[in-house]
């Protein structure tokens, strides 16, 4: 992986690209898709403000990606009733959106460029990509297992975050929670097709084991040449080199 330091008048950010192709996309700095997770204490108003300020300074165009309705599945997997889970997700995503809108407006970005997974549910490009992911999930055991492993880590991470004692993660819990992974993956492999941009980097603060496997061509699902992944951290913290093993929602 390639590591760079980007300096501004206010804040240092460290970036790490997943592949050499990601690094080439980064050099051109045409577009970045900033990922913001719900129920993650990192994404405070101040952090989102700093992150988006950095993104607007460094890239020609900035979009923000928020969770969709599938985030409720993780809460349901841990026992939250369906209706309550949906309400909690709507409230949290609204909070994330409000902070992102405020930051984009403050730094010259476009508040209209904030999206959730669910916004594209009926879009042809997104639906085709999701079908591609779902086909691999059902046809390739090793891809299915990798997705379920990510869901397992997310369930345990969410349980830790809420101080819940989970004795065993059942198959039903995994099947419910994995919907979030499936909904998110199209933005990892081909976000330009969805957003209508030439190329982009999906920016997040951690490595992603499943993404690393995709970038190594271990599955039928492939990252497109105009798609990259970028790990971003503030200078006083370390971009973790270990594979991601915490919740993304």
UniProtKB/Swiss-Prot annotation:
First-tier enzyme category under EC: transferase
InterPro entries assigned: CDPS, CDPS_sf
Annotated catalytic residues: 37
Site location (Could have a critical role in the catalytic mechanism): 40, 184
Site (described: Could be involved in aa-tRNA binding): 88, 98, 180
Outcome following mutation: residue 40 to D: It is able to bind L-leucyl-tRNA(Leu), but has almost no cyclodileucine synthase activity
Catalytic activity: 2 L-leucyl-tRNA(Leu) = cyclo(L-leucyl-L-leucyl) + 2 tRNA(Leu) + 2 H(+)
EC number: 2.3.2.22
Gene Ontology molecular-function annotations: aminoacyltransferase activity
Binding residues annotated for substrate, in chain numbering: 40, 180-184, 204, 209-210
Gene Ontology biological-process annotations: pigment biosynthetic process
Effect of residue 88 to A: Strong decrease of L-leucyl-tRNA(Leu) binding, but moderate decrease in the cyclodileucine synthase activity
Effect of mutating residue 98 to A: Strong decrease of L-leucyl-tRNA(Leu) binding, but moderate decrease in the cyclodileucine synthase activity
Quaternary context: Monomer.
Protein name, entry field: Cyclo(L-leucyl-L-leucyl) synthase
Source organism of the structure: Bacillus licheniformis (strain ATCC 14580 / DSM 13 / JCM 2505 / CCUG 7422 / NBRC 12200 / NCIMB 9375 / NCTC 10341 / NRRL NRS-1264 / Gibson 46)
Gene this protein is translated from: yvmC
